[in-house]
Amino acid sequence: MKEIAIIGPTASGKSDIAVDIASKCNAYILSVDSLSVYKEIDIVSAKPSKEELRQIKHFGIDVTYPNEHFSVERFLHLYQEAKEQCKEHQKNLIIVGGSSFYLKTLITGISPFPKFSHTVQKKVSKILCDVDEAYRLLQKIDPTFAMKITDKDRYRIEKGLLLYFQTGLAPSDYFQKNPPRSINENIQIYEIAIDRKTLRKRIEDRTKRMIQKGLIEEICTLEKKYTREPNAMKAIGIKETIHYLDGKIKNIKDLEHAISTHTAQLAKRQQTFNKTQFKNKIALTYDELKKKILQAMAD
C-alpha cells in the first residue's frame, strides 16, 4: 500500500488530479478540506461530483452537519479508517485538499488527551454556559494558552478547562509534558505549482460556476436550517452570499468579485503555509505533477 498527499492552493486542480490518479492506480481518496466534511454544503465547498464519488471511494466527505464541530481528532480518526480500509481492500491512499493544517498534524501528531471524568465534563459544561466568563477563567489559569486562541473559540476553551480540571495542570504545562506523537511522517507530498494569474482566472471561473449552479439558493437553505452561528457558516463563499442577501453587496457581479478576492487571499495564505511547513515536497506544474505521481505509484 502506498500513501501520498497532493496539496496546492484552492482551485488549483488538486481534486481532478487525485480522481484521475486514483482511477489509474487502484486508490481510495481521503479529502482534507474543512468545508467538504459538512453535509449539505455542496456547491460552495466545490466537492467532487456525484459521479466522481461513485467512481472512487472518498473519505472525509459529508461526515458531519454544519452545526457540529469538526476537530483535528476527528480527521485523524478518518485517516485511520481510510488506511484500514485501504489495507483490507488492497488499495493505495491519496490524501488531497487545501486544509493542509490537517495534513501537517498527521505528520507531526497531536498530544494524547486523558480520559475526562463525567464530573469534570459536567463542571466545565456548566462554566461554558457563559463563554466570556469561561475564557476569563482560562486566562487566569493559563495566560499563555489563552493568548493563542480567541475568546469565541468555545472548542479550545473547553479543551483547556477540561485538561486543567482533570489533570491539575495548566494546558501549556500539560502539552509540554505530553509532546505530540507523529502518526505518519513518511508521506510523500506533491504540490501543484501554479502562477498567480492562472490561479486567479481559475478562481474567478469557479466562482461563476458556483453561482450558476445555485450557490445563493444553497446558502438560503443552510441559513434557514442552521442559522448564521456555526463556524461553517462563516466560510468564504457563504459569508459574502449572506452579505448579498442582506443588501450589503449590491449585485451578482460584486458578489462574484468579493468571493473571488477573498478566495485569492486564502490561496495566498495556503501557499505560504505549504511553503513553510512542508520541506520535502515535490512541486511541479499540473501536467508534470500528474506524470511524476503516476510514475511513483507504478514503481
Swiss-Prot record:
UniProt-annotated site: Interaction with substrate tRNA, residues: 99
Segments for region (Interaction with substrate tRNA): 33-36
Listed transmembrane segments: none
Database matches in Gene3D superfamilies: 1.10.20.140, P-loop containing nucleotide triphosphate hydrolases (3.40.50.300)
List of residues binding substrate: 10-15
EC number: 2.5.1.75
Keyword Nucleotide-binding: yes
A Pfam short name: IPPT
Catalytic function, reaction form: adenosine(37) in tRNA + dimethylallyl diphosphate = N(6)-dimethylallyladenosine(37) in tRNA + diphosphate
UniProt GO MF annotations: ATP binding; tRNA dimethylallyltransferase activity
Binding positions for ATP per the UniProt entry: 8-15
Keywords: ATP-binding, Magnesium, Nucleotide-binding, Transferase, tRNA processing
UniProt keyword ATP-binding present: yes
Names of the cofactor(s): Mg(2+)
Similarity annotation: Belongs to the IPP transferase family.
PANTHER family recorded: TRNA DIMETHYLALLYLTRANSFERASE
Quaternary structure and interacting proteins, as annotated: Monomer.
Name this polypeptide is given: tRNA dimethylallyltransferase
Annotated gene: miaA
